[in-house]
Structure formats: C-alpha cells, structure tokens
Amino acid sequence: MTSPRKSEPGPEARGGQEDWRAGVVEELAEHIAAIEAGEAAPGEGSNPLRGGVFRDHETEKVVVKECRYVLGLLGHRQRSEAEIRAKLAQRVHEVDVLEEIMRRLDTAGLIDDEGFARAWVEQRRESKLLGTAALRRELEDKGVAAPDIDTVLAETAPYDSEKERCQILARERLAKELRKSGGAENLDRGAALRRIGGALARRGYSENLTLFVLNRELDAAGVTWS
C-alpha cells in the first residue's frame, strides 16, 4: 500500500520520535534484565518490539538484543528492509529467529522502504545533484522494490527540478573546461559535449536532457562549432 508523502518533521516531531525511541530502548533493557534474572518476561504492552517470550528466555534475549541493535543502526540513518535483513543475517543464523526480529520491527513501524527511499532521494539529490536514473540504480542496490522506487521518484522528480540540477552541473563542468582551454574561442564544442555529457550521464541524467541543457549552456558561453 502506498503511504502518503511525509513532510520533513519539525523540531517537536523529531523530539517526539527521539523520546519514543529512548522509551523503546529502555523497555528493551528492562525486558532483557528480567529474562536474565529468570523472571517472567513482560507481555507486549505498549512496546511492539517486546512480544513476550519467543521459544525460550535465551532466544528471547537474542531477539530483543537484535531489535535494540537495529534501533542503534536507525539512529544513524534510515535503512531499507534489505539492508536491515543483511545486517541481521551477519549476526543471527537461525532463520526463524531472524524472521521473528523482522516481524517485530515491522510491527513497530521501523521497516518502511518507501519512507527510506524518499529520505535517500532527497538527501542524494541535495548533496550529489544526482539524476533520476542514478537514484534508481542506488535504490535498487539498496534492495528497494520497483513499485516503491517508482512511487517516490514520480512524486519527487518534476522535470523542472531535474533540469535545474542538470544545468547546475553542466555550468560547473563547462566553467572548468573554459578555464582549462583559456576561453570559449579555444574550446572544441564537440569535445566539450562528449566530456561534459559523459559526466552528466554518469550522474544519471538522460541523453535528451543532457544535450538540451549542454547546447544551451555552450551557446550562452559563446562556444561555437569549429
């Protein structure tokens, strides 16, 4: 199911999320302590990461410890389901235990590939000025499913914004070419198109958009065909 687009949380919302996570971690610590002391484990209560005792107390300790480990990972940045699963698979070798951990994380709302993809796209567009094709490749590498990628890219990639980012990169690259060649009169337009076009393609911009933007920038800079 496609979730509505989430706006950037304000300070109050972020503070509430941090308080919630702190509460979850505290409850998990109490849960582990109770199990280690041989006491009856608390029921689910308000914490979806605590599900009573899974199989036995020793296994339950593993489950809640790994849930806490994932919370630590998510404290640094959001992660896709595939990333979380891969991290856990390095630490947990019993399939049913790993699946129980994933189930609890999902119940707690900590697995959200569409939300992860949206945050990833916004961050990478801002920091690296990546185009849609490059972002799609990165999300595929992160294990995000095609429908989630399509949804996020469709709502966050209007043509005008893509063109603006392409123009910024094209101008930066062209400025370097002009400095190296000593001016527009010394710059080979065909060679500049190939070099800058290749750089933009590697950033994920389409050939049609790249040619459109580059030719306009070259015209504006006075770079002619030799």
What is each PLM-predicted segment?
Residues 1-226:
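An alpha-helical, amphipathic repeat domain used for nucleic-acid recognition
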